[in-house]
């Protein structure tokens, strides 16, 4: 998995960033394990082994949630988004529109594209800089 490795030299990163990276990689690994155990359980025809695999999957879910909570406690951005989107039954895109004041469906609409053929993301060139 590409995210296991640091993308910048470790000596340039704060301990906070390195610890967050460890937590994010751990979360990815736990979620991947959930998927693997579920697939194994689905494919398993022996009831006893099936039950063990489901038990193991549920343990991985617990580990993932513990890690996610650690991340939430240390990241105001994660905390804010989790408070917006989790533990509600309202439509997710409705929550997003309310939170950001914009609608994703409008942004994806073909009629909202600029008429000049641009993707609407602006120039990537820096002002005053020639190639």
Swiss-Prot record:
Pfam families: EncFtn-like (PF22277)
Reactions it catalyzes: 4 Fe(2+) + O2 + 4 H(+) = 4 Fe(3+) + 2 H2O
UniProt entry keywords in alphabetical sequence: Encapsulin nanocompartment, Ion transport, Iron, Iron storage, Iron transport, Metal-binding, Oxidoreductase, Transport
Record text on activity regulation: The ferroxidase activity is inhibited by zinc.
An annotated GO cellular component: encapsulin nanocompartment
Residues binding Fe cation 1: 30, 60, 63
Binding site for Fe cation 2: 30, 60, 63
EC code: 1.16.3.1
Bridged cysteine pairs (disulfide): none
BP term (GO), one: iron ion transport
Segments of this protein annotated with the region Disordered: 96-131
Keyword Iron in annotation: yes
Matches recorded under InterPro entries: EncFtn-like, Ferrit_encaps, Ferritin-like_SF
Stretch list, region Targeting peptide: 98-131
GO MF annotation, one: ferroxidase activity
Assembly: Forms dimers at all pH tested; under acidic conditions formes decamers. The N-terminal domain (residues 1-97) crystallizes as a decameric ring. Four decamers are loaded in the encapsulin nanocompartment in a tetrahedral arrangement. A 3 nm gap is consistently seen between the shell and the cargo. The target peptide extends away from the decameric ring, to allow binding to the interior of the encapsulin nanocompartment shell.
Domain description: The decamer has negatively charged patches on its exterior, and a negatively charged tunnel at the center, the charges are probably metal-binding sites.
Protein name according to UniProt: Encapsulated ferritin-like protein
Species assigned in the record: Haliangium ochraceum (strain DSM 14365 / JCM 11303 / SMP-2)
Biological classification of the source: Bacteria, Pseudomonadati, Myxococcota, Polyangia, Haliangiales
């Amino acid at each position: 998995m590409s995210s296991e490795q640091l993308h910048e030299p470790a000596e340039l990163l704060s301990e906070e960033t390195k610890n967050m990276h460890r937590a994010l990689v751990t979360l990815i690994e736990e979620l991947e394990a959930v998927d693997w155990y579920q697939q194994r359980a689905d494919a398993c025809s022996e009831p006893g082994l099936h039950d063990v695999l489901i038990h193991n999957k549920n343990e991985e879910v617990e580990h993932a949630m513990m890690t996610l909570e650690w991340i939430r406690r240390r990241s105001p951005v994660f905390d804010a988004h989790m408070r917006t989107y989790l533990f509600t039954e309202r439509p997710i895109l409705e929550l997003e529109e309310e939170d950001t004041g914009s609608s994703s469906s409008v942004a994806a609409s073909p009629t909202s594209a600029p008429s000049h053929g641009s993707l609407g993301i602006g120039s990537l060139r820096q002002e005053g800089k020639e190639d």
